[in-house]
């Protein structure tokens, strides 16, 4: 599965990387973020684009599967 590693990046970089993946990836992909507000922003952004989002906490970080 394609993976966007946005851990440690400042906003709006996680959203920009997610948007690029939405444009280029045909199937599901994973986004990794390190901050709760990044998780919230990426999740809302993907849902606003009509995507299904599954969120999982991995330690102090987050994994979002976007389909």
Language-model-detected regions and their locations in the chain:
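Short glycine-rich, basic-tinged beta-strand/loop micro-motifs
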Residues: 22-34
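Amphipathic alpha-helical interaction surfaces in cytosolic regulatory modules
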Residues: 13-20, 36-49
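C-terminal edge-of-domain segments
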Residues: 53-67
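An N-terminal amphipathic alpha-helical segment
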Residues: 1-25
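Iron-sulfur (Fe-S) cluster-binding modules
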Residues: 23, 49, 64-66
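A generic structural signal for beta-strand entry/edge sites
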Residues: 1, 28, 59-63
